[in-house]
Structures are given as C-alpha cells and as structure tokens.
Regions:
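Long, charge-rich low-complexity segments
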Residues: 192-200
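Generic structural signal for individual residues within well-ordered alpha-helical segments
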Residues: 66, 87-90, 148, 185, ...
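Alpha-helix boundary recognition
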Residues: 41, 189-192
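GST-like domain detector, emphasizing the conserved glutathione-binding G-site
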Residues: 1-129, 135-137
Length: 200
C-alpha cells in the first residue's frame, strides 16, 4: 500500500490526498508532529511534506509526487493527453508554484507589504476568468491544476478555525472572496466536496 507522510493542515499534502482519491488509490496517511520531523528527515533526507512511499520508492516535493502518481498510475489522468494542452498545464503549475506563491510567502515572512497583498488579491480575477464556461481550471475535468491550486485558493472562502499556520492566515486575510467571484466560489465548493485519501 502507498504510505503518505503528512503534517496537519499542510496545503502541499492536500494536493496529494486529492490526487490519490481522484485516481482511486488507497494509502496509509502517517501524520507527524510539525515540531518533530526527525522521522521524515530519516526517511527522505529533508523535512518537508508530503513524502510518499511507494513500493520501496520514496518521493518528496508535491509537484514530483503528482508526476510520480501520473506516471505510475495514469488512469484517470491528471494531465491532458494532448501535447500542447499538457505543456500549457505544466506552465500553469510552474507559474503557480514559483510566481503565485511568492507574495503570500513574503507577507508571512514579514518582508512583504502592500504591493504583495495587491498582487495576491489581484490574482483572483485570473482564476475567475479561467473558470468561465467550465467547471475546472483546465476544462471539464479535474486536473493537476485543480489539485495544485485549490489547497491554497480555498482559504479565501473555507478554512478550519483551528488552523493557525501563519502562511494560511495570510491567505485568509488577503484572499477573502464570495459573491464578487461567483465562478471561483463555485469551483472551491466543487473541489472541496471531492474526497481525499485518508478520509475517515
């Protein structure tokens, strides 16, 4: 069985639990104390989650884990089969991970301010436009784009009050939306209703 190492409220772990459930894969979810990641370090050589164990192979870093799952368990697919569309999705993932996440990280680290907050807030219109006439970010079906973005964007609409992670509090404060972004609101609720691996 697949084994996924996690900490509570991890956005990057939720990317993987969504993908696993979408692919119908069973996994054992192993939760670690955020303040003691020694077991994660021993297993993977680094302290970040998610870390996936799959038949003796250890994979860390959520984009790499998503790619691993797609390669080893290709159905149902998280990437379009068309070469051009698949490349477009890769560009979106790279933009989200390297560009979109920069402002909230800067704010959480105390080095960001008004400019970063405006960038973060301004990105909501981009997602609203992507969802015009379609239920998911890249069309009619769930893809790696939804798995990648949802765990972060959701904080503008839904969150657990017990989650006091500073980065997440930044998202709650600067991404709040509702009727002003109706398509985005529907998308968050649509993906939020999807199962996750490890759900009891």
């Amino acid at each position: 069985m697949l084994r996924l190492h996690a900490i509570p409220f991890s956005t990057n772990v939720e990317r993987i639990t969504l993908a696993l459930a979408y692919k119908g894969l069973q996994c054992e979810l192993v939760e670690h104390d955020p303040d003691d990641r020694s077991a994660i370090l021993r297993l993977s050589g680094q302290e970040l989650v998610p870390v996936l164990e799959d038949d003796g192979e250890v994979v860390s870093d959520s984009p790499l884990v998503l790619r691993h799952l797609e390669r080893k368990y290709p159905q149902p697919p998280l990437w379009p089969t068309e070469t051009a569309r698949s490349a477009e999705l890769d560009l979106f993932l790279d933009w989200f991970n390297r560009v979109w996440k920069r402002p909230p990280n800067a704010i959480a680290d105390g080095i960001g301010g008004i400019t970063e907050a405006a960038e973060l807030r301004g990105s909501l219109g981009y997602f609203e436009a992507l969802l015009a006439g379609r239920p998911f970010l890249f069309g009619g079906g769930f893809t790696a784009a939804d798995a990648t973005a949802f765990p972060f964007i959701k904080y503008g609409l839904v969150f657990d009050p017990a989650d006091d992670e500073p980065f997440h509090r930044v998202l709650i404060e600067h991404l709040s939306f509702g009727d002003d972004h109706p398509r985005l609101t529907e998308w968050v609720r649509r993906v939020d209703a999807m199962p996750r691996a490890g759900d009891s």
